[in-house]
Amino acid sequence: KEGYPTNSEGCKITXLFNDPYCKGXCINLSTQAD
């Protein structure tokens, strides 16, 4: 996962674009507090 966004904002953004490298983190952060 190195080289890919792992912070909440980055994951939210990549999630919008369905980034497979951050999808898990995106979903994880989306279900948690903003």
Curated annotation (Swiss-Prot):
The keyword Secreted applies. Expressed by the venom gland. This is Non-toxic venom protein. The keyword Secreted applies. Has the structural arrangement of an alpha-helix connected to antiparallel beta-sheets by disulfide bonds (CS-alpha/beta). One of its GO terms (molecular function) is ion channel inhibitor activity. Belongs to the long (4 C-C) scorpion toxin superfamily. Sodium channel inhibitor family. It comes from Rhopalurus junceus (Caribbean blue scorpion). Gene3D superfamilies: Knottin, scorpion toxin-like (3.30.30.10). Its main location: secreted. It comes from the Eukaryota. Does not cause symptoms of intoxication, paralysis or death in insects (A.domestica). Residues 1-34 form the LCN-type CS-alpha/beta domain.
